[in-house]
Amino acid sequence: MTAITALLTASLLVPNLAPAPTAMTAEAVTWTTANSVATGDQDLPSIAMNRNGQVAVVWEDDRDSTAPEDDTHSEIYLRLFRDGTPGYELKLSNGGTSGAAWRHISPDVGLDDKGNAVVVWAADGDGNGVYNIQYRVVSPTGAVLGSGQANASDAGQQIWPKVGVDPDGSPTTAAVAFAVVWEDVQGTAPATVKAAGFTAPTTKGYEVTASQTTGTHHRPDVAVSASGEALVVWDEDADANGSYNIGLTRLARSTGAVVLSRRTANAQSGGQQRRASVAANFAGDFTVGWESDHTGTPGVWARSFTAAGAARHGEVEVSTGTGAIVPSVGIDDQDNAVVGWTVSGVNPDVWARGLNPDGTVDGRLAAQALSQTTTGRQEHFALAASPWGEVSVCYTDDNDGNAFDQVLLGLGTTNSTWLMSADELRRLKARGTPTH
């Protein structure tokens, strides 16, 4: 009998006895390998989930049987799971020029509440070392509804794309609407952050510079709420002094006009703030995570905001110990946040922790290693939260030490110290009751 079953059985046998709060553990999570083919090396996964039990995972897939450190001829794969059951699996990229060192790398995925997935990645199909941002819109059954290039101009380098998807469609619920952001490098000019908004799979509403045009700007992320507006964060050095903050703005649905003035998500300005991650819920409340070393010790920090852009609390350190890097964040419809990160080192580990809307941790997912095993190397951690407080995670795993990674998917975590069965969660969803 599992811990979950025992708790639920006790509550049924003894009247008015509620299950005692129990910290979630990795053993309570259902683990599966996201990629169905183990050949080669799978890297840099990303994950999204919606309110209806669907989870989408994307990754780089290099089927070469040698040199796992070399991402030449990597393709982009997408797999959808419905209530934990595998659905479709698709190769979305189109290879490249024969004999060339082509690559498709750094994918990201978003998912609306109907189950439509949007995937973006950096593509170099001719192997000339110059990347553009490709996207695909995929239906709940795995049909490609639209494809294209997010950036209008091929000039320069377009790298590190991210995508946010309107959960209920915009401008109508029948549409698939999304925003794409990326880092744009033109020759020797400092990098900027670009954003493009789409109101349908092939209907582009705008392309704008999301960051300031002065200074240098890197590695954006984006989240889209039901309003259709795009929240954008990035590594910002607008004054070109070499010190980075976390830039933050919001762009209008149809025009890309700035509707939340450009500002910094972090209040502490000492040291370096980098690798921003953002997530928004249906109402537009959002949370931001990033790396910071302003205390003298690098760690992962987070801060939550209202839909109007007002901070709910000062930034809080989420990680414990040293070596925490590359945060990933999620938020539910009760404004509870969850933050994941990788602990760097010879044998990296992946961790997660939950936060209340005010930045406290009582009652939320306890800080812990959240992987199937801690043997060997686990890294490239990504997570997503549903409106109900469910948490899905993925990461790359090399527990056998052969240097070839697989993508592990973990389902069944909740951002709460109260464990519940899948049946109980479905009943709560049917009643419209938050899991808080």
Predicted features along the sequence, with ranges:
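C-terminal cell-surface addressing/anchoring modules of secreted/extracellular proteins
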Residues: 414-436
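Secretory targeting and sorting signals
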Residues: 1-23
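Intrinsic disorder/low-complexity segments in short proteins, especially the signal peptide
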Residues: 12-13, 17-18, 256, 360, ...
